[in-house]
Every structure is written in structure tokens, then in C-alpha cells.
UniProtKB/Swiss-Prot annotation:
Organism ancestry: Bacteria, Pseudomonadati, Pseudomonadota, Gammaproteobacteria, Enterobacterales
Biological function: Involved in the recycling of free 50S ribosomal subunits that still carry a nascent chain. Binds RNA more specifically than DNA. Binds with very high affinity to the free 50S ribosomal subunit. Does not bind it when it is part of the 70S ribosome.
Designated name of the protein: Heat shock protein 15
Taxonomic source organism: Escherichia coli (strain K12)
Region (Disordered), start-end ranges: 105-133
UniProt-recorded Gene Ontology molecular function terms: DNA binding; ribosomal large subunit binding; single-stranded RNA binding
Family membership noted in the UniProt record: Belongs to the HSP15 family.
Induction: By heat shock.
CC annotations in GO: cytosol
InterPro entries: HSP15, S4_RNA-bd, S4_RNA-bd_sf
Gene that this sequence comes from: hslR
Amino acid sequence: MKEKPAVEVRLDKWLWAARFYKTRALAREMIEGGKVHYNGQRSKPSKIVELNATLTLRQGNDERTVIVKAITEQRRPASEAALLYEETAESVEKREKMALARKLNALTMPHPDRRPDKKERRDLLRFKHGDSE
């Protein structure tokens, strides 16, 4: 017979306790929106979290893969919350590469020294939308 864990915690509550999201409502929204995968599959917020489960989280441009190491439903300080999971080495490496690529991409984009004045702004609009005169 299967032994029940001491604490059963919903996925949305665990993500909130592990400090991936500020509110449970936001965690629930991300799960329902397909941004969180539990063991490689889409899940529901009410899914019970198990030890050593693999979670894939998409947050903005970042995607991280974590393994559940501990289960709690209480939100603790960030230093303690980091002990609830372990990010995989591939995930860390991939996030660092993506951050570097974003940083390098930002360097190639032109940033003007000042805002365009009235004449320059009109010239930009004419260029973007074509000369309507």
C-alpha cells in the first residue's frame, strides 16, 4: 500500500511558498496559462506536489527547470525557500547563455542621446507611415 506523505501541498501553493510567484493567484494563472509544466506535462493548480518531481517554469524570457527537494505550504524567507528546490545544471547554463545574448543584443541597438524635438519627431512619423502630403 502506498504511504501518504506527511504534507500534501497543491502546486500553486508550493510555487508561492518557494517564492517563484508573489501571490497564489499569480501562480495559479501561470499554471493555467501553460507556463508551468509538472514532470513534462501541463498541469492544474490543484496538482499535489511530490518529492523529486521536475518542474519547468517560464518567467518572461527565462525558462528554468527545477527539481522539488522539500515540500511545505508556508512561505518562508528567500534563503529557506531556495532549499525547497534545486535548479538543474543545464537550466542554469541555458539561462546564463540567454542573459548574455540579451545583453549583447542590447549593445547593438542604437540609443539616442536625447528625445527627438518637434521637427525630428514629425520626420520620424513621415518616415514610418509614409509621406501623406
